[in-house]
């Protein structure tokens, strides 16, 4: 970093760009002589959520900058990433709008670390209380017009035409477009697949004060993104709950979604047959594992946003939507103590139900994501 500081700004930009291109080549396993164009999208180069984090970790190790796990989505090509890297390493002397997705290199997140430590020690209730108290102190918005920036919609699929499939990211601390990258990769044609990221999870973003504020902010972004084009909504876990409520809001605006797909979504009121604390511990264990690997990602902001958002979704029931709905149910329980009927109150309100191999997480990962995507694709095509 000191060596970079001694360079003139123009030369520094070139060095950072070369560093990004070289690091991308290394992560992809290409020969050192391989040339990557500065404006070539990372998606076209073959980056996914895992290789994106590898690139992020490599750049952090080389520069000391703290970058988000979703870096290849926030900064879609080497030149854009190099510019963002320069902005955080050498910020302007005058105050300016923060660089989206980047945080201070000197910040130590004690609050977030306390939460992770409590979760690792099995102190779920204490961890939740701690972060809910923090969430209550964060800035809130009641009207989407109060936001500095609208929730982002990020193209994650390779197809450039076809009806829109908007995947609503879950309201959890690991949220981001990377949740759906493997799912989106399965749709090589026929659908324009994008991810919609909820507000409040990035540094400095306000939290929605109410469920209505959350849904309206997302609806504004979707309306701007798709116009009057055909669209379907997909959501995994809490993302499915938000997708359902978002569809109702769009329906009220005269922008009727073709369909809504809920991938193992559920209400948050301790449904009968689900061992609530064990289930939540299993969910959090997986997310903590990810955050430990992708450390430095604004833990306090992300965790308080998760706790607050899930509070907003309490009491949810799938009612008031005219669009057809599909519930995708994993056949493998997340914890052995689950009873198969605990999803009943949600499933009973769905148009269709499809069982797929895997558990709550693996239905969107590895060998099982293909089965999930095929079920969704087949069901949506039959509606057309």
Place the predicted regions along the sequence by residue.
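A short alpha-helix capping/helix-coil boundary motif
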Residues: 1, 33-36, 224-226
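Short, contiguous strand/loop micro-motifs
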Residues: 7-8, 42-43, 234, 303
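Generic, ordered loop/turn and secondary-structure boundary motif
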Residues: 5, 37, 43, 51, ...
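A hydrolase-biased, glycine/serine/histidine/acidic-enriched motif that marks catalytic-domain neighborhoods
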Residues: 18, 99-384
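Phosphopantetheine-dependent thiolation modules in NRPS/PKS and related acyl-activating systems
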Residues: 10, 14-141, 265-270, 370-373
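Glycine-rich phosphate/pyrophosphate-binding loop
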Residues: 1-12
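Short acidic (Asp/Glu) and glycine-rich catalytic loops that position anionic groups and cofactors
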Residues: 1, 60-65, 352-353
